[in-house]
From Swiss-Prot:
Mediates the nuclear export of proteins (cargos) with broad substrate specificity. In the nucleus binds cooperatively to its cargo and to the GTPase Ran in its active GTP-bound form. Docking of this trimeric complex to the nuclear pore complex (NPC) is mediated through binding to nucleoporins. Upon transit of a nuclear export complex into the cytoplasm, disassembling of the complex and hydrolysis of Ran-GTP to Ran-GDP (induced by RANBP1 and RANGAP1, respectively) cause release of the cargo from the export receptor. The keyword Phosphoprotein applies. Residues 30-96 form the Importin N-terminal domain. It is found in: Cytoplasm; Nucleus; Nucleus, Nuclear pore complex. Binds to nucleoporins. Found in a complex with XPO7, EIF4A1, ARHGAP1, VPS26A, VPS29, VPS35 and SFN. Interacts with ARHGAP1 and SFN. Interacts with Ran and cargo proteins in a GTP-dependent manner. Its main location: cytoplasm. PANTHER family: EXPORTIN 4,7-RELATED, EXPORTIN-7. Disulfide bonds: none annotated. The modification Phosphoserine is found at residue 570. Belongs to the exportin family. GO terms for biological process: mRNA transport; protein export from nucleus. One of its GO terms (molecular function) is small GTPase binding. This is Exportin-7.
């Protein structure tokens, strides 16, 4: 330890500086010194001294957090005896010092929880020494309220700690601990918590007493943590509320069949202050979400009846719901009524008619008070959406009454949104229309609700639309109209256009009638008439939100009524013909294109409208029949012949805008490329005519690059716009004929300009990203479009350019030096990721024979591969998995390299090989299934290569192993632990996890076993011996059957036999391990 950290007094002073000082320099120096202290050899003993003799709470906090780090480290872990001593010391410390600062108590409880979790499978004299949590806290629970709070908090924190995976330990180990804790301890903790809550609620708690206040809060947190436990390892995304089934184990059935458990929480809700109620309701949300299969039909009906009664009681006494947190949780509870139970079950509940009336009134009132808890509306709309969607399927004879209440909900939503417009504008409030994501989510829900009793929805929309449209027209014609009045009507019309688009988008083909299609026609006519009015005023004024609503409407209309699947006899088209003279789909498409051109002309500098407009054009260009109709329109021919900034301002070089604003150009040119291809065929003149603006742009950049001094900003903007345009065209040209025209146009004339741009601006991702993405698209053999003639060297020439760009970018980006963590992806890793994708596309495109490079002394392949290695070694392992796009590009490239270029992998330095193998090992447990599957494939190729080389080396052959293979074998023999670790990981996942890619996992496993037969035998014995005595024979038999009929080779027939055996093995092991609470006491299995 450093000299200046010698005494406790000095340590305490450093803690004070760290937590109290306002001077940044002093705090940083204290932090640095304390980091040294944490890493020092005598940290453990000093921590104990700080806890024993420290005079400040900060020094106690430091000691607790340092000890937590010490027990959590994976390298050089503390011995078992020492960890037992720390656990016992912490419990005694908490038991003898009830008056510690809250944050110190919390830190010590966290330390206890961490030790317990990480030592869950540690044994001493056949005793799992860290599994006595309930015994550990009993003495706290039998003491005063202060001690009782500590005991409950320990259980709560432990449950939470075991439920959460951490990045420093493998996910397989986490799931193993969580499963064992669930089976051995969690139900006892839940039962204890409920019993303590019953005792507390029966005692008429004195909630003015701060300590009793705290006890109730901790008990509710503990109960919620138990119910919120990830029982089967599926809750990887905690932000999602959609997967709302709680997978309660069958052994918990008794607690939920007993109605007093449910009743306890409803009673608590009514008897405690509103500040505690949100936690009670959170528990009820989880209880309402228990899996359906926990009950039989009669039990479920009884449980649902109690649940509905409890909800009814809350709705009849809604005073506490004025608290936003209570209201939010109660809305979540209502949503679970339909997500977990069927409408046919709900209508059979005795009080259903009264409850559905109360829920409808509550929903209508909530929607009318739109400014109160807007984030909770999602749950209410979710309930009604699910109810409405169930109406066609309900078979129960009891009335569901939704035909009465659903229109009320629809009306409340529509009228409340319209009424909000004036208040928001008058008071300068935040406009919900600004949050298009939230609006879209609500409209998706309303689309189903509104189609229930659709004639009522349409009548309301027609009435409201006509009123607003008439008022709007009158205001526009009036010279004295105030801007405020115009803005109000535009806001109302914006909501109505969004809602009309939504209800049209909610049309379901099998449930729609001619009358409903005619109603859709009425609504569409009105929106198109409004569009004609607003478009005629665009030269003077426009409303961005209304335009975005129009685009949303067009998108919904396109999905339902335009395309190959739509019946052209639809009553909607008849109505459009009568009112607007639009007789068929081609005429409607001309309206679409007219609107698209108008938007691009008048809104070219408004990014949201431009990008949505271009997305609409792009979607139209995908349909087989619609794209052929579009090409015949004069407006589309105008676009194909005049795609310049003169006609479309967003294509201009605007020095005020950001370079990233040009992204939409790719979408534009993808659509134009598809439209051009319809009639292009082999017409090179038409192609060259189309490319004239891009040719001029390339020539302009070439001219700038040829001079020593040029306007860098102008050059950057011209080039970035150009490469984004080209990428759109390259993506659209997925046929050989058209793509060859593009290739011959760009190579060799313009390729040097792209290389020069990378050379000049490698440090500016706004320039390099579009250039690299264009190159990655050009080398992508999409739809086999890169098929060169047998006499053409173009495949090799294209790869040379690819290699040159990767090498140039890679060597220069590595000169950036240290990049701040928050900028490392944008400045470095994103470009590297695209290079990996580019190299993968080139290597797997099947248009280059890579054997010729070495044969003719061409270093293009070697340069690209060596640059890949340099770039890879500059990336920490953690980053490879932390950034999803980088993960996918790296592992898919590695898959190609291990499949086709194993000789290159074998020739690498030992530390590089170990780096690659480590990355595969870590990727095997990745949450992303694509990454995990890719790693299995890489591992399979490596193991197969190793096995073949090993087989050859043992045979008497005239041709010896080449130098690379020999060295690779030697490295792997020196470091068997890496392959053994992966064998252990794969086996662990197959046996103990919810393995979603079992076939992929099975492919490398046979090779791993054949390469490590002794290790596999030890591992098998370890797993068998870890089972309860009565299950060991069954487990042994499972392993015997796994290798039944398997030969010592990796021929396809043998592999397939093994894969079949493995499927049976997994089923048998799962059956054998059911009801077993024992874990695998093996360091290899757990690491």
């Amino acid at each position: 330890m450093a000299d200046h950290v010698q005494s406790l007094a000095q340590l305490e002073n450093l803690c004070k500086q760290l937590y109290e000082t306002t001077d940044t320099t002093t705090r940083l120096q204290a932090e640095k010194a304390l980091v040294e202290f944490t890493n020092s050899p005598d940290c453990l003993s000093k921590c104990q001294l700080l806890l024993e003799r420290g005079s400040s709470s900060y020094s106690q906090l430091l000691a607790a957090t340092c000890l937590t780090k010490l027990v959590s480290r994976t390298n050089n872990p503390l011995p078992l005896e020492q960890r037992i001593d720390i656990r016992n010391y912490v419990l005694n410390y908490l038991a003898t010092r009830p008056k510690l600062a809250t944050f110190v108590t919390q830190a010590l409880i966290q330390l206890y929880a961490r030790i317990t979790k990480l030592g869950w499978f540690d044994c001493q004299k056949d005793d799992y020494v860290f599994r006595n949590a309930i015994t550990d806290v009993t003495r706290f629970l039998q003491d005063s309220v202060e001690y009782c709070i500590i005991g409950v908090t320990i259980l709560s924190q432990l449950t939470n700690e075991i439920n959460q995976a951490d990045t420093t330990h493998p996910l397989t180990k986490h799931r193993k601990i969580a499963s064992s804790f669930r089976d051995s301890s969690l139900f006892d903790i839940f039962t204890l918590s409920c019993n303590l809550l019953k005792q507390a609620s029966g005692k008429n708690l004195n909630l003015n007493d701060e300590s009793q206040h705290g006890l109730l809060m901790q008990l509710l947190k503990l109960t919620h943590n138990c119910l919120n436990f990830d029982f089967i390892g599926t809750s990887t995304d905690e932000s999602s509320d959609d997967l709302c089934t709680v997978q309660i184990p069958t052994s918990w059935r008794s607690a939920f069949l007993d109605s007093s458990t449910l009743q306890l929480f409803f009673d608590l809700y009514h008897s405690i202050p509103p500040s505690f109620s949100p936690l009670v309701l959170s528990c009820l949300v989880q209880i309402a979400s228990v899996r359906r299969s926990l009950f039989n039909n009669a039990e479920r009906a009884k449980f649902l009846s109690h649940l509905v009664d409890g909800v009814k009681r809350i709705l009849e006494n809604p005073q506490s719901l004025s608290d936003p947190n209570n209201y939010h949780e109660f809305c979540r509870l209502l949503a679970r009524l339909k997500s977990n139970y069927q409408l046919g079950e709900l209508v059979k509940v005795e009080n259903y008619p009264e409850v559905i009336r109360l829920i409808a009134n509550f929903t209508v009132t909530s929607l009318q008070h739109w400014e109160f808890a807007p984030n909770s509306v999602h749950y209410l709309l979710s309930l009604w959406q699910r109810l409405a969607a169930s109406v066609p399927y309900v078979k129960a004879t009891e009335p569901h009454m939704l035909e009465t209440y659903t229109p009320e909900v629809t009306k409340a939503y529509i009228t409340s949104r319209l009424e909000s417009v004036h208040i928001i504008l008058r008071d300068g409030l935040e406009d919900p229309l600004e949050d298009t994501g939230l609006v879209q989510q609500q409209l998706d829900q309303l689309s189903t609700i509104g189609r229930c009793e659709y004639e009522k929805t349409c009548a309301l929309l027609v009435q409201l639309f006509d009123q607003s449209a008439q008022s709007y027209q009158e205001l526009l014609q009036s010279a004295s109209a105030s801007p405020m009045d115009i803005a109000v009507q535009e806001g109302r019309l914006t909501w109505l256009v969004y809602i009309i688009g939504a209800v049209i988008g909610g049309r379901v083909s099998f449930a729609s009638t001619d009358e409903q299609d005619a109603m859709d026609g009425e609504l569409v006519c009105r929106v198109l008439q409004l569009m004609n009015l607003t478009d005629s005023r665009l030269a003077q004024a426009g409303n961005e939100k209304l335009e975005l609503a129009m685009l949303s409407f067009f998108e919904q209309f396109r999905k339902i009524y335009i395309g190959d699947q739509v019946q052209k006899s639809s009553k909607l088209y008849r109505r459009l013909s009568e009112v607007l003279g639009l007789n068929d789909e081609t005429m409607v498409l001309s309206v679409f294109i007219g609107k698209i051109i108008t938007n691009l002309k008048y809104w070219g500098r408004c990014e949201p409208i431009t990008s949505r407009t271009l997305q609409l054009l792009n979607d139209l260009s995908i349909g087989y029949s619609s794209v052929r109709k579009l090409v015949k329109l004069s407006a589309v021919q105008f676009m194909l012949n005049n795609h310049t900034s003169e006609h479309f301002s967003f294509l201009g070089i605007n020095n005020q805008s950001n370079l990233t604003d040009m992204r939409c150009r790719t979408t534009f040119y993808t659509a134009l490329g598809r439209l051009l291809m319809v009639d292009l065929g082999e017409d090179e003149d038409q192609y060259e005519q189309f490319m004239l603006p891009l040719t001029a742009a390339f020539e302009a950049v070439a001219q700038m690059f040829s001079t020593n001094s040029f306007n860098e900003q102008e050059a950057k903007r011209t080039l970035v716009g150009l490469v984004r345009d080209l990428r759109g065209i390259a993506f659209a040209f997925n046929a050989k004929t058209s793509f060859m025209m593009l290739f011959e146009w760009i190579y060799p004339s313009y390729m040097p300009i792209l290389q020069r741009a990378i050379e000049l601006w490698y440090h500016d991702p706004a320039c390099t990203t579009p250039v690299l993405k264009l190159m990655a698209e050009l080398v992508h053999n999409r739809s086999r479009r890169l098929q060169f003639d047998v006499s053409s060297p173009n495949g090799i020439l294209l790869f040379r350019e690819t290699s040159k760009m990767i090498t140039m970018y890679g060597n220069r980006i590595l000169t950036l030096g240290e990049v701040p963590k928050d900028q490392v992806y944008a400045l470095k890793l994103k470009g590297i990721s695209i290079c990996f994708s580019m190299l993968k596309a080139a290597l797997s495109g099947s248009y280059v024979n890579f054997g010729v490079f070495r044969l003719y002394g061409d270093d293009a392949l070697d340069n690209a591969l060596q640059t890949f290695i340099k770039l890879l070694l500059s990336i920490p392992h953690s980053d490879l998995l932390d950034y999803p796009k980088l993960s996918q590009s790296y592992y898919s490239l590695l898959e190609v390299l291990t499949q086709d270029h194993m000789n290159f992998i074998a020739s690498l330095e030992p530390h590089v090989i170990m780096y690659i193998l480590s990355s595969i090992s870590e990727g095997l447990t990745a949450l992303d299934t694509m990454v995990c599957t890719g790693c299995c494939s890489c591992l399979d190729h490596i193991v197969t290569y190793l096995f073949k080389q090993l087989s050859r080396s043992t045979k008497k052959r005239t041709t010896p192993l080449n130098q690379e293979s020999d060295r690779f074998l030697h490295i792997m023999q020196q470091h068997p632990e890496m392959i053994q670790q992966m064998l252990s990981t794969v086996l662990n996942i197959i046996i103990f996890e919810d393995c979603r890619n079992q076939w992929s996992m099975s492919r490398p496993l046979l090779g791993l076993i054949l390469l490590n037969e002794k290790y596999f035998s030890d591992l098998r014995n370890s797993i068998v011996n870890s089972q309860p005595p009565e299950k060991q024979q069954a487990m042994h038999l499972c392993f015997e059957n796994l290798m039944e009929g398997i030969e010592r080779n990796l021929l396809t027939k043998n592999r397939d036999r093994f894969t079949q055996n493995l499927s049976a093995f997994r089923r048998e092991v799962n059956d054998s391990m059911k009801n077993s609470t024992y874990g695998v006491n093996s360091n290899d299995m757990m690491s």
